[in-house]
Amino acid sequence: MDLVSFAFSGPATHADQAPLYIDAKRPSRSLSEAPFRRLVRSLVAGFKAYGVERGDTVLVQLDNLVIHSALLFGIVGAGGVYMGCSPSSPRHELDHFVSLVEPRLILTVASALSVVRDVCTNKGISWSQICLVDDQSVDHLVSFAQNQSYNPQATPPVRDEGVHFDLKDMVSFGESDWMRIYDEATARITPAAMFSTSGTSGLPKAAIRTHHTIISHHQTVHYDVPYPVTRLMALPMSHSFGDFWSNLFPIRYGHPLYVMPRFDLSTFLNVVHRYNITETYLVPAMVHILNQSTLPVRESLGSLFYIGVSGAPIDADSLQRCQKLLNPQACIGQLWGMTEVGVIFQNRYGDQRYPGSIGKLLENYDIRLVRLDDGTTIHGESTPGELYVRGPGIMLAYQGRDDGIDAQGWFRTGDIAYSEDEHYHIVGRTKELIKVRGYSVAPAEIEAVLLKDPRVHDTMVIGITLPDGSTEVPRAYVVCALGQARPTADEVSALALKNLASYKALDGGVIFVESLPRTGIGKPHRSKLSHLDAQRTKLAALLSPV
């Protein structure tokens, strides 16, 4: 089956035609089942009219929008491949994406238009392949979808090779059925979407997800819950984690989705309270913001039953602090996944036995833990090893590369994990481990300790090499909390020394900064911080007295 058919063939009857995709800031901008279907079919016709053929990529460079899911299904329904990226992507990253996926069309916003034009000019791409998306065009598409009496003629707008076009032109071509796939073999090899990897250790890669992998992944993760589901999405929908909870659930199961353009604490709390949100998904940085907030968080989150957390490591103490902000029937739990493999570990609603774990392995997936020293497979519990994964929801490949998945179907995650009573725990990443006199130190463990101090708003730990080259040691970069007394470097170091083994001490020092580099979804960008740290060291050497 193809992805669009799967979306529209769910158990939801939509008898009441209740809103499914809702703009959290302007709830009147919403789409119920019939308008959503009409919009998808019209966008299928529009993307075809603008030259999208089977296998062509459409690069979607947008913040979260109420029409985002319709755009994705319109692209896929036309036979194309959706690829999302942030409108704030720097020029070099956008240039990389355009070279990597060779898009037929680029959907972008006014603030990014000049950068997109420059990149297209350098790549020999006509500006007529650029589609501008603004508030007016979103309004137009929503109104068009809701107004069943409006039937535009399939007359192509006048196109100028040197000028971008507007998204509202996409719905000027009538409706078209979507591309159908009836056999599993074809669905297994037909790309539907690509999602960029985090790029924390270099330029991002594009992981190809086929119709079959997306459907299989969804069927594995979905489960019934004993509460009415109304979700709030504040994560980037262009990222695989945000995408998963945004697109299929509303139309397939009738679960309303409120869409925020981006996370803002005050707006987030207001939307949860006002619209009785029962389920949402966050990254650890957002959990820390909730824990440290002086706003009436507990009163605002009373309707929530479940918060799923993923995207980066988070400690049990931070999760338990957030748990105390929720109603007694609610729970917060970690998930684990990657862009390349999807979500494969999950703490489901009601399972809170191991709050620091990433949950149980989901059905239909295989994993193995491999020792770092000799590469042998670990069979017992409580022994950390590098995590390898295989299963039906794993990516087809990286775009333009032949690495990533071995001949037996295993994907090497780079994460270090161990098991305990069928629940798994993440220790850290192999590339991020700090080698201190023969010991392996995970930065996330030190960060979790420092974040317990209310004076620490954010922190990131990296490894630096001592001047004599004898060993690496941890160095902490710290952002102080507003409205709190500023801690000294010695106080921060003492906090780590008091709670951790001596070889995990911050012997590389503590440096206070205004902000820390993170990816769009909140992952620590340690490679960028390490680069900045190296520049800082060079500058300090130049400025030091002779």
Swiss-Prot record:
Specify which residues bind AMP according to the UniProt entry for this protein.
M194, F195, S196, T197, S198, G199, T200, S201, G202, L203, P204, K205
- What's the name of its gene? olcI
Q: Indicate whether Ligase appears among the record's keywords.
A: yes
A Pfam family matched by this chain, by name? AMP-binding_C
Q: What happens when the gene is disrupted?
A: Abolishes the production of 15-deoxyoxalicine B.
List the catalytic activities from the record: nicotinate + ATP + CoA = nicotinyl-CoA + AMP + diphosphate
Q: Note the InterPro entries from the entry.
A: AMP-bd_C, AMP-bd_C_sf, AMP-dep_synth/lig_dom, ANL_N_sf
Question: What name does this protein carry?
Answer: Nicotinic acid-CoA ligase olcI
Q: Which residues form a coiled coil?
A: none
Miscellaneous notes: The 15-deoxyoxalicine B cluster is a rare cluster that contains its own geranylgeranyl pyrophosphate synthase (olcC), in contrast to other related clusters which rely on a FPP/GGPP synthase localized outside of the cluster.
**Protein's job:** Nicotinic acid-CoA ligase; part of the gene cluster that mediates the biosynthesis of 15-deoxyoxalicine B. The first step of the pathway is the synthesis of nicotinyl-CoA from nicotinic acid by the nicotinic acid-CoA ligase olcI. Nicotinyl-CoA is then a substrate of polyketide synthase olcA to produce 4-hydroxy-6-(3-pyridinyl)-2H-pyran-2-one (HPPO) which is further prenylated by the polyprenyl transferase olcH to yield geranylgeranyl-HPPO. Geranylgeranyl pyrophosphate is provided by the cluster-specific geranylgeranyl pyrophosphate synthase olcC.
Give the matching PROSITE patterns.
AMP_BINDING (PS00455)
